[in-house]
Amino acid sequence: MPFDRDKLEELRSLAQRDFDRAWKEGAKLVREPGLRDRYPRLKVETGEPHPLFETIQQLREAYLRAGFREVVNPVIIPEEEVYKQFGPEAAAVLDRCFYLAGLPRPDVGLGADKVEKLAEVLGREPSEDEVERLRETLHAYKKGEIDGDELTHEIAEALDTDDGTAVRILDEVFPELKRLKPEPLEPPLTLRSHMTAGWFITLSEILKREDPPLKLFSIDRCFRREQREDESHLMTYHSASCVVVSDDVTVDTGKAVAEAILRQFGFEDFEFVPDEKMSKYYVPGTQTEVYAYHPDLEDSIEDEELGPGWVEIATFGLYSPVALAEYGIDYPVMNLGIGVERLCMVLHGIDDVRSLAYVEYEPWEPSDLELARMIDYERKPATSFGERLVREVVRGLHEHADEEGPVEVELFRGEFGDREVVVHAVEEEKGEPLAGPAAFNRVYVLDGNLYAVPPEGDFGREIREEGVYSGVSFEEGLAARLAYEVEELLATGGGETTVSVRKVSRPSQVNLSLPRKLLRYVTKKGGEIEIKGPVFVTLRAEVR
């Protein structure tokens, strides 16, 4: 909220007479952070890219810097295109492809039994005109004149009813629609299983209007019907693929392009090994695996033959003239492909490719600071009056902590509207201090463990120095609960309330809230939650 203008004017006037005093007095106008907006719970949120799409963007920039132009390749590939590219091997290759299918448009009848059921759902007899309009609607749906996502609304219009009733009609009057089974599309269509399937189609069209040399790249999703998904296999993945079309393309072109792209990611040395797979769309002997060395990977990745820091990262080859001839392409073409997920895993130290596609596989390793931000008070005041009560009670409890019982100390007195609030700390036992030895314990997070330790002294020193303070403490938690209950009394007409704690064995006793995700994390990692101690504090409030 803005500063009080009258007080600002007073400070301005005072500064003309005594600047140093005015400067010090100005501190009183600065608002203290409340329980709800205090660091570390107060955080400036920032966005964070997904590592997969961050890698895609880095690859896009790498290709562009290397002089390549970005294009979009077809995702839906007719089956016949696979035969043109693979020849006799196509039948085996298609086994890994997903085929597209769709639900048939049935010829739905509207006999007497359907009309009778329709009347039950409508709660009235449909008119002859309504039945005829419904019949016409179903016929139009059969012919494809009405899309599936429009059918509910069209039925509602035909019968002069609402969409909710139309949904019931589809479900109860025409249950056969739920029993429809997908049927393969004709002609057969597949989802792109590798980027090459799209490159032949794209190049055949581009070369009708452009002359070589061409340097093109495309980064997009491919689909492969794996037997199962595991740590290294997904049914959908991203390929960062490029082609070079030129009269002078050779295998060395692939080597040079691989180096140009991968050096931008910190890879320093390269080995090129003939690939034993020998795909039929490549010229025999040109399909090549690219191994690259990265100095930062020496401790995490090791190739059996090349040693630490070496990893297989890409494949390239020259397209077969046999396949090119099927598309009327007269020029040599080099194709390089980089698996985006593979590169992302290498660069980010990811062990399970599924973590890039499914949230449930993402490793969750929150920092101590992130865990500290999760710790809060279960009950806390909602008003500035309640916040002030908390501050003064905490301050007074610190000042009078060592006073011995029997004793009763006033910690707060204030007015809220026409009501007065008075808070006392009470110790009835003779010779016992007003606050026990653990009354001022603060909660820290260290290496994923939660500890409550005193604010000073030898006990807990290492935790205080190396851990992250959560911003919550025992005495403030008790004061916050008391302030919450005082606000409840102010809203209901007054009365008395007491917050009293002796030995603490669980966080809720001092009004601390630990979310389930934090508890699950600490428990799963076998961590500790040591929030306990002899508090021995009693706070009493009266609203009158």
Curated annotation (Swiss-Prot):
<keyword id="KW-0030">Aminoacyl-tRNA synthetase</keyword>
<comment type="subunit">
    <text>Homotetramer. Interacts with SepCysS.</text>
</comment>
<feature type="binding site">
    <location>
        <begin position="281"/>
        <end position="282"/>
    </location>
    <ligand>
        <name>substrate</name>
    </ligand>
</feature>
<dbReference type="InterPro" id="IPR006195">
    <property type="entry name" value="aa-tRNA-synth_II"/>
</dbReference>
<dbReference type="GO" id="GO:0006412">
    <property type="term" value="P:translation"/>
</dbReference>
<comment type="similarity">
    <text>Belongs to the class-II aminoacyl-tRNA synthetase family. O-phosphoseryl-tRNA(Cys) synthetase subfamily.</text>
</comment>
<dbReference type="Pfam" id="PF01409">
    <property type="entry name" value="tRNA-synt_2d"/>
</dbReference>
<dbReference type="GO" id="GO:0005524">
    <property type="term" value="F:ATP binding"/>
</dbReference>
<dbReference type="GO" id="GO:0043039">
    <property type="term" value="P:tRNA aminoacylation"/>
</dbReference>
<dbReference type="InterPro" id="IPR045864">
    <property type="entry name" value="aa-tRNA-synth_II/BPL/LPL"/>
</dbReference>
<keyword id="KW-0067">ATP-binding</keyword>
<keyword id="KW-0648">Protein biosynthesis</keyword>
<dbReference type="GO" id="GO:0000049">
    <property type="term" value="F:tRNA binding"/>
</dbReference>
<feature type="binding site">
    <location>
        <begin position="194"/>
        <end position="196"/>
    </location>
    <ligand>
        <name>substrate</name>
    </ligand>
</feature>
<keyword id="KW-0547">Nucleotide-binding</keyword>
<feature type="binding site">
    <location>
        <position position="335"/>
    </location>
    <ligand>
        <name>substrate</name>
    </ligand>
</feature>
<keyword id="KW-0436">Ligase</keyword>
<feature type="binding site">
    <location>
        <begin position="239"/>
        <end position="241"/>
    </location>
    <ligand>
        <name>substrate</name>
    </ligand>
</feature>
<dbReference type="GO" id="GO:0043816">
    <property type="term" value="F:phosphoserine-tRNA(Cys) ligase activity"/>
</dbReference>
<dbReference type="InterPro" id="IPR002319">
    <property type="entry name" value="Phenylalanyl-tRNA_Synthase"/>
</dbReference>
<dbReference type="InterPro" id="IPR005246">
    <property type="entry name" value="O-Pseryl-tRNA(Cys)_ligase"/>
</dbReference>
<comment type="function">
    <text>Catalyzes the attachment of O-phosphoserine (Sep) to tRNA(Cys).</text>
</comment>
<protein>
    <recommendedName>
        <fullName>O-phosphoserine--tRNA(Cys) ligase</fullName>
        <ecNumber>6.1.1.27</ecNumber>
    </recommendedName>
</protein>
